């Protein structure tokens, strides 16, 4: 009598089908190589731009989130809230999910992403990408004597969204973050260690609350304190400087 095949193998077994699905799924999980589609992305991948501060200096728009991943690999994200939103249609109410995500490296860079999608996971994934595209530098300063590393906001700044107003006030070293949980987590991801905050309005609306905090923190980079008054030579933008290289790379892509 012929020996029977092991269970799960051979014709009619279930083992082969499971292994086949695993191999197909592994290909989907493989990371694809980044192929830049913008001029800024091609310069970044070619190594012509050394830091993300050069992009901010010339106010170049970031259209690819991979540029942020290239310069800031240690970004952390925090899902602040996911709320269902509805839209009335002829077929009835269409429910979608709106995600608010704050992303930052705790070292002077923070972004806010908001995205709506039919599924929660898709909304969070899209909000993370939007947060990377909207990432902004945060200028830090001192409360008193300039000793050690910058630890607080350089000046008083305010941000407003809807009825919510958030004010950030410099604090002495060791004071910590005197803020609501939403603003506190936002400032932690921004890299601010000590800060007093004031908030007014309907702070229960978390979306407007975190938007106002982001608007206030973004203003710190637009204020020049006396130590930044020195004149600096302002040359061509990287896109103008490396125009010849961009013409060559366009043919490759």
Curated annotation (Swiss-Prot):
Ranges where the S5 DRBM domain occurs: 75-138
Superkingdom as given in the UniProt entry: Eukaryota
Cellular-component GO terms for this entry: cytosol; cytosolic small ribosomal subunit; small-subunit processome
Record keywords: Cytoplasm, Ribonucleoprotein, Ribosomal protein
Location relative to the cell: Cytoplasm
Skewed-composition ranges (Basic residues): 14-26
GO molecular function, one term: structural constituent of ribosome
Keyword Ribosomal protein: yes
Residue segments, region Disordered: 1-30
GO BP terms in the entry: cytoplasmic translation; translation
Any Pfam family: Ribosomal_S5_C
Disulfide bonds: none
Entry-linked InterPro entries: Ribosomal_Su5_D2-typ_SF, Ribosomal_uS5, Ribosomal_uS5_C, Ribosomal_uS5_euk/arc, Ribosomal_uS5_N, Ribosomal_uS5_N_CS, Ribsml_uS5_D2-typ_fold_subgr
Keyword Phosphoprotein part of the UniProt annotation: no
Family: Belongs to the universal ribosomal protein uS5 family.
Role played: Component of the ribosome, a large ribonucleoprotein complex responsible for the synthesis of proteins in the cell. The small ribosomal subunit (SSU) binds messenger RNAs (mRNAs) and translates the encoded message by selecting cognate aminoacyl-transfer RNA (tRNA) molecules. The large subunit (LSU) contains the ribosomal catalytic site termed the peptidyl transferase center (PTC), which catalyzes the formation of peptide bonds, thereby polymerizing the amino acids delivered by tRNAs into a polypeptide chain.
Subunit note: Component of the small ribosomal subunit (SSU). Mature yeast ribosomes consist of a small (40S) and a large (60S) subunit. The 40S small subunit contains 1 molecule of ribosomal RNA (18S rRNA) and at least 33 different proteins. The large 60S subunit contains 3 rRNA molecules (25S, 5.8S and 5S rRNA) and at least 46 different proteins. Interacts with snoRNA U3. Interacts with MPP10. Component of the ribosomal small subunit (SSU) processome composed of at least 40 protein subunits and snoRNA U3.
Name of the protein in question: Small ribosomal subunit protein uS5
Species the sequence originates in: Schizosaccharomyces pombe (strain 972 / ATCC 24843) (Fission yeast)
Primary gene name: rps2
């Amino acid at each position: 009598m012929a020996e029977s095949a092991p269970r799960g193998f051979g014709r009619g077994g279930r083992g082969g089908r499971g292994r086949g699905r695993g191999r197909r799924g592994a290909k989907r999980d493989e990371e694809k190589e980044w192929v830049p589609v913008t001029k800024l992305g091609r310069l970044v991948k070619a190594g012509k731009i050394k830091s993300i501060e050069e992009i901010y200096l010339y106010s170049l728009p970031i259209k690819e989130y991979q540029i942020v991943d290239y310069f800031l690999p240690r970004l952390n994200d925090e899902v602040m809230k996911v709320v269902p939103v509805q839209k009335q249609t002829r077929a009835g109410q269409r429910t979608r999910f709106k995600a608010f995500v704050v992303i930052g490296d705790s070292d002077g860079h923070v972004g806010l992403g908001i995205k709506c999608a039919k599924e929660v996971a898709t909304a969070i994934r899209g909000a993370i990408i939007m947060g990377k595209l909207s990432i902004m530098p945060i200028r830090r300063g001192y409360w008193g004597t300039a000793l050690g590393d910058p630890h607080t906001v350089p000046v008083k700044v305010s941000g407003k969204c809807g009825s919510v107003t958030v004010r950030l006030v410099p604090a002495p070293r060791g004071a910590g973050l005197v803020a609501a949980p939403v603003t506190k987590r936002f400032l932690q991801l921004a890299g601010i260690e000590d800060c007093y905050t004031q908030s007014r309005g309907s702070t229960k609306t978390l979306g407007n609350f975190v938007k106002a905090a982001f608007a206030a923190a973004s203003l710190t980079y637009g204020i020049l304190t006396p130590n930044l008054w020195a004149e600096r030579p302002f040359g061509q933008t990287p896109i103008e400087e490396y125009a010849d290289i961009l013409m060559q790379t366009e043919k490759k892509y």
